[in-house]
C-alpha cells in the first residue's frame, strides 16, 4: 500500500539537510544512510548515497530516472543462490 497523497513523500530530514549542504558547497561526497524508506528528490540527482542493505552500505548513484522512487529499491537485501540439487551445491556455496 502506498503512502497517502495528502501527506506527501517521505524523506529523512537529516539526509535532505546533508544533501542541501553539499549542494550549497558544490561538493560531491558519498553519504552513508540507513534510511531505505526515503523518497529520492530532485536535489539528490548527481550524488552517490551509500544505502544500508542490512550487512553493508551499497553505493547508489542517483540519476533523474530515479526521482520519486525509494532508496531501498536500489540496494537489494536478499541474494538468491539458486534452488537445491546437486549442481546448486557446487554453485551456491560461499567462498
Curated annotation (Swiss-Prot):
Keyword Lyase included in the entry's annotation: no
Stretches with biased composition (Basic residues): 80-95
Q: Which InterPro entries does the annotation name?
A: Ribosomal_uS19, Ribosomal_uS19_bac-type, Ribosomal_uS19_CS, Ribosomal_uS19_SF
Instruction: Give the Gene Ontology MF terms in alphabetical order.
Output: rRNA binding; structural constituent of ribosome
Q: Which GO terms describe its cellular component?
A: cytoplasm; small ribosomal subunit
GO terms for biological process? Answer: ribosomal small subunit assembly; translation
Question: Which UniProt keyword terms apply here?
Answer: Ribonucleoprotein, Ribosomal protein, RNA-binding, rRNA-binding
Q: Segment Disordered: which positions?
A: 75-95
**What SUPFAM superfamilies does the annotation carry?**
Ribosomal protein S19
Pfam family example for this protein? Answer: Ribosomal_S19
UniProt cross-references to HAMAP family, sorted A to Z: Ribosomal_uS19
| Family note | Belongs to the universal ribosomal protein uS19 family.
| Protein name from the UniProt record | Small ribosomal subunit protein uS19
Supply the source organism for this entry: Roseiflexus sp. (strain RS-1)
